[in-house]
Amino acid sequence: MPRSPASTNSVSSRPLEIADRLAFVDFRVFVEPQQGATYSDQLAVARAAEALGYSAFFRSDHYLAMSGDGLPGPTDSWVTLAGIARETSTIRLGTMVTSATFRYPGPLAISVAQVDEMSGGRVELGLGAGWFEEEHQAYAIPFPPLGERFDRLGEQLRILTGMWKTPVGQTFDFSGKHYTVVDSPALPKPTQSDLPIIIGGQGAKRTPALAAEFASEFNVPFVPLDTLKTQFARVADAVAAAGRSADSMTYSAAFVLCAGSDEAQIAARAAAINREVEELRSNSPLVGTPAEIVDKLGPFREAGVQRVYLQMLDQSDLDHLELFAGEVIRQLS
């Protein structure tokens, strides 16, 4: 298991080392369907994102709205992505993030591998420990203490990767504290030989260690620049301690999107998601005019952010994606 950062000095210097070698790779669309979206709504966003050149469509994996009534109700993330996989052709697909509390590791390995095959090898798995206790209570899902949730996450990652990497014709076994696998044929296999795994969050020790052991991408969602730098540094130290090359990890961030050609359009989009413009501006670099957003992204780029997830909360506003692609991404490409 990779160690935690050895000293404060190593943490503070690491973001500059990251920034020296990285630039934005791509922009991805990220939706929250539990707030109120049908499968058709999500498909429309995915198709628009694909047509506009975004590299990926990601969705949350939640069963309960954080605010509002969430009508018409939640949609299952992997059922949804299976459908979208058959109705798109190039855009990558994934979860940000699947909760390890929702599914047993064996069935999850099967579902992810199947959707990867259905998509022709375009799936990525974001996996986390789970945090939203109310949704577990609402849908009869056990919600163990935080330490146990992280233990289960680690075991799930070992089982998922173990099953996928077991050669065809051989079997996989695992004996852990929470899960046991006996004589599994470890089928089906994903289409991708090394299906990307994304781990994220702000945990100081176990999160960076798990990322260094299992992930090809580390994501920090909705945090200020200083917090992002600190967490990227922890992960970079863990990657180095694990003996991995520095460029084997992609560093990403997620932010709320609220862009407009002028202040009136920005205000209208903020109102559509029941947020105040100034509050959004203070918490996300993706809020403002295209020129403003390009400027605000600069420090995040310098801090080592390679990939940006646009949290699109109003899924009916496809013009929003068009504006960002045409006026922001164009300036950064």
What are these regions (language model features)?
Residues 2-3, 9-333:
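Active-site-adjacent structural elements that line small-molecule/cofactor binding pockets in enzymes
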